[in-house]
A protein has these predicted regions:
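Short S/T/G/P-rich N-terminal loop/turn motif that feeds into the first structured element of a domain
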Residues: 1-70, 74-93
Length: 93
């Protein structure tokens, strides 16, 4: 069964979301990431959804996210609220 990280972000400014999206596009997805979505949900908020084939892959991505949050992204991201769980329904076209 696939597992997912659902991560809520609060950014310093609305421009910070665009800066993050550019950074993420340039750095690519995390290793073994099957699906990656990043959606603006408000002026300074967004949500990311990342799906992984195994719990170990998800945990490895958590470590990388935490490292990036404390270094590369610390100036533009105000708060990161990660959640995780099993993927129960998965549709792609």
């Amino acid at each position: 069964m696939s597992v997912a990280n659902v991560t809520m972000f609060e950014f310093q400014t609305s421009e910070s979301i665009e800066e993050f999206a550019s950074w993420y596009k340039g750095h690519g997805t995390y290793p073994n990431n099957d699906i990656s979505l990043f959606v603006r949900t408000g002026e300074t908020s967004a949500i990311g959804i990342s799906v992984y084939p195994t719990e170990q892959d998800r945990q490895n991505a958590d470590k990388l996210r935490n490292e990036s949050a404390s270094t590369d992204l610390s100036e533009i991201v105000k708060e990161i609220m990660p959640l995780s769980g099993d993927v129960l329904v998965h549709f792609l076209r």
